[in-house]
């Protein structure tokens, strides 16, 4: 699995940040202003201590204005002492309090604006990640999914994206705010006492090292939890799809036991993750307290020394500023914990996003033209990884003709059909439509030539109308009804509660097998493709349903070029050519009568089905 280093993590996040650069800039500006007003508000404590309560008896004189801290500090003290002399200490205290309130208002106001500008980035990144992940899943070729569990893919799209949203995106604000606050505060600490600050910076990395060790362990356990969650979701998906088989074989206890074992392993891993995560706050608080204690001791030594340049009030201000670093540092530590927790999910997401689709669109595609002549397989060979599935296939399918593919399971029938719309690409040879190699067309144009009706009708949890119009834009109600009538589906559709607006349930679960198949045929009729692919479309139906579906198929096949995969040989007697496949090769071909006379594999299959 792809490992995401710290640099790769930053690059990965930057891929999604592009549209939100304005938000990032505004957030940084607001955080800087918030930090500035924070320093200013706390700086008011020093004159209160040193002048108002006469910690120092010093006379200040006005200095010509210059952009340096000594001049600014001297002139601030000058105005305050003058105000005390003219208006008294009580009014001065009130004025300083007003300044403190105003500074705090601007500090909190800019802090809110920083969050206000970063929230669209945070929510937008998650939305964009979901969109890109879904688009990638739709765009990837079928070979990718043959190596992945469906439940694991669903976990990446739902659980992992949710984890990234919870762990990483919730930390974006802390990552954008706290480093700025910490750097500005540390700069202020250097100004107050560079010796004390250098000592602090020697102590802090030790705390960071301890936190980092725990965070690394957290990331590892989080990855285990996500992988186990994918296994759990896979079993749930398989259980829901195979309940009939589970009950028929009295396997309820077995699958429940297996699920419980998966669930227990997930529970143990999540327990370890949460324990490590909950360690972050008390550990950071303890280390922060230890650091403050060390600063108090070392700072006290500096103040008590005779040559100290730090006053007691400056040290108190130093402690206040240092204490204000603790909270951003703790939040930053928590953010890093969250990121370590979410990076495991980000790695799993990026594995899909970075998956390479071997089906490449040609740079200068051949423009689509009406299908007028023939489909040709020329010396076509294909393999899954190292195993050859098709070997040296040659086949010509003239326009308007029906060609049937028969043979035992695993002989290569479905693979041969899948190569035509480029669900996979041939390894050797070529497939052409009207003499044009299918690889030189856009996938959209190529697949626009074709309509599919499969053994298992693929329907969606939507209305009858939307299932029939799937992939066909701007279809009218009259066109949909006409397609349904041709497919022998209109009558049962109108008998439903809301007719064409009736929801058919998950995968068309509210319909019978024959009804689902007829909706699938209606969808193909509405698309009106010149090339039709029928994959064992009636093999799983009862006699009455098969009759209705077969009649609908005959209506669909009129004047169309048709490729049929069938196990029931009685349905393809009228095919213009029947190709018998065995171990990836076409071993017999001809009409039904020709193949019976040949007395080969086809006749054996036909005789077995006639018994």
Enumerate the predicted regions with their spans.
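Helix-loop-helix
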Residues: 188-202, 276-347, 352-353
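An intracellular "coupling" helix at the cytosolic face of ABC transporter transmembrane type-1 domains
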Residues: 16-22, 142-143, 159-168, 172, ...
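Membrane-integrated ABC transporters
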Residues: 1-43, 50-100, 106, 114-118, ...
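Juxtamembrane helix-loop junctions of ABC transporter transmembrane domains
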Residues: 2, 6, 37-46, 50, ...
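ABC-type nucleotide-binding domain
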Residues: 361-362, 368-611
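Conserved catalytic Walker-motif region of ABC-type ATPase nucleotide-binding domains
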Residues: 137, 259, 377
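Transmembrane helices of ABC transporter permease
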Residues: 23-36, 173-224, 297-310, 327
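Hydrophobic alpha-helical transmembrane bundles that constitute the permease/transmembrane domains
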Residues: 28, 32-40, 101-112, 164-167, ...
């Amino acid at each position: 699995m792809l490992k995401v280093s710290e640099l790769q993590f930053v690059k990965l996040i930057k891929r999604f940040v592009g549209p939100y650069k304005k938000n990032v800039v505004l957030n940084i500006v607001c955080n800087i202003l918030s930090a500035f007003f924070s320093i200013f508000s706390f700086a008011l404590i020093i004159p209160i201590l040193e002048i108002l309560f006469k910690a120092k008896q010093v006379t200040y004189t006005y200095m010509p204005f210059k952009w340096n801290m000594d001049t600014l500090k001297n002139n601030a003290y000058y105005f305050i002492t003058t105000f005390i002399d003219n208006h008294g200490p009580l009014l001065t205290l009130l004025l300083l309090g007003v300044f403190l309130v105003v500074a705090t208002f601007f500090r909190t106001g800019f802090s809110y604006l920083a969050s206000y500008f970063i929230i669209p980035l945070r929510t937008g990144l998650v939305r964009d990640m979901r969109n890109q992940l879904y688009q990638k899943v739709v765009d990837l070729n079928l070979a990718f999914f043959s190596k992945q569990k469906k439940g694991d893919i669903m976990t990446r799209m739902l659980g992992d994206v949710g984890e990234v949203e919870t762990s990483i995106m919730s930390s974006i604000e802390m990552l954008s705010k706290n480093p700025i606050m910490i750097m500005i505060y540390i700069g202020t600490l250097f100004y107050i006492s560079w010796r004390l600050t250098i000592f602090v910076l020697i102590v802090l990395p030790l705390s960071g090292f301890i936190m980092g060790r725990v965070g690394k362990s957290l990331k590892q356990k989080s990855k285990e939890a996500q992988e186990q969650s994918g296994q759990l979701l896979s079993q749930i998906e398989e259980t829901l799809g195979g309940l009939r088989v589970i009950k028929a074989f009295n396997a309820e206890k077995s699958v429940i036991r297996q699920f419980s074992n998966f669930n227990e392993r997930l529970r143990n891993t999540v327990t370890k993750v949460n324990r490590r995560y909950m360690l972050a706050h008390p550990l950071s608080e303890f280390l922060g307290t230890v650091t403050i204690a060390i600063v108090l001791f070392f700072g006290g030594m500096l103040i008590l020394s005779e040559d100290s340049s730090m006053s007691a009030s400056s040290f108190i201000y130093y402690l206040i500023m240092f204490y204000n670093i603790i909270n951003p540092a703790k939040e930053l530590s928590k953010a890093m914990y969250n990121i370590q927790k979410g990076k495991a999910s980000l790695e799993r997401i990026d594995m899909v996003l970075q998956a390479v689709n071997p089906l490449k669109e040609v740079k200068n595609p051949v423009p689509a033209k009406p299908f007028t002549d023939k489909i040709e397989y020329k010396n076509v060979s294909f393999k899954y990884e190292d195993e050859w599935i098709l070997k040296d296939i040659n086949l010509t399918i003239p326009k308007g003709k029906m060609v049937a593919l028969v043979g035992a399971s695993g002989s290569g029938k479905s693979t041969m059909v899948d190569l035509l719309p480029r669900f996979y690409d041939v390894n050797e040879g070529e497939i052409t439509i009207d003499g044009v190699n299918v690889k030189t067309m856009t996938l959209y144009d190529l697949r626009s030539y074709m309509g599919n009706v499969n053994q298992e009708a693929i329907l969606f949890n939507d209305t009858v109308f939307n299932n029939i119009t799937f992939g066909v834009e701007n279809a009218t109600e009259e066109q949909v009804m006409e397609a349904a009538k041709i497919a022998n589906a209109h009558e049962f559709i109108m008998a439903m509660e809301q007719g064409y607006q009736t929801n058919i349930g998950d995968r068309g679960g509210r319909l019978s097998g024959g009804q689902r198949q007829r909706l699938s045929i209606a969808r193909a009729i509405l698309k009106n493709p010149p090339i039709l692919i029928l994959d064992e479309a009636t093999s799983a139906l009862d006699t009455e349903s098969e009759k209705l579906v077969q009649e609908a198929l005959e209506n669909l096949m009129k004047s169309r070029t048709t490729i049929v995969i069938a196990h029931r040989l009685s349905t393809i007697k009228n095919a213009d050519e029947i190709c018998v496949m065995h171990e990836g090769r076409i071993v017999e071909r001809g009409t039904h009568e020709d193949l019976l006379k040949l007395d080969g594999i086809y006749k054996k299959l036909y005789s077995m089905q006639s018994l």
